[in-house]
Amino acid sequence: MPTRFKKTRHQRGSTFCGYGRVGKHRKHPSGRGNAGGEHHHRINFRKYHPGYFGKCGMNHYHKKKNTTWKPTINLDNLTKLMAKDEAMKAKKGEVLPVIDLLANGYSKLLGNGHLQAPCIVKARWVSKLADKKIRKAGGAVVLQA
């Protein structure tokens, strides 16, 4: 049967509006937020949030990530990192190509072999012999952190 007013309009002035005496139907009967996730809300947490509770593994605070990482490359392999046209320009003495070893996945430059064309090398570590050979060929070394 259609009624003129909604239930809330009918209950205006009745003090409790269908929810019993003072204190009933109020506050947080099942706890706030994630309360009871391992108790009375267990089904919900197990179904929709598996793995929410409990620990897994160990925490290593202030871990230094791989301090021994030092992939090396020799002088004779440096030209492989250069484009062919860059090597030709360097031999003519036009523009020196810049080789960034860190961007290519290397951190240390070793002095085995000979440098075919002068270039500017950016590296984290460079051996004394490699530095000497690069400068002799007319290039330069830039150390990076």
Curated annotation (Swiss-Prot):
GO molecular function terms listed in the Swiss-Prot or TrEMBL record: RNA binding; structural constituent of ribosome
Disulfide feature: none
Recorded superkingdom: Eukaryota
Record key words, sorted: Ribonucleoprotein, Ribosomal protein
A biological process from GO: translation
Record flagged with keyword Transit peptide: no
Location of region: Disordered: 20-39
GO cellular component, one term: nucleolus
Pfam families (UniProt xref): Ribosomal_L27A (PF00828)
Gene3D superfamilies the UniProt entry points to: 3.100.10.10
Protein name from the UniProt record: Large ribosomal subunit protein uL15
Species: Trypanosoma brucei brucei
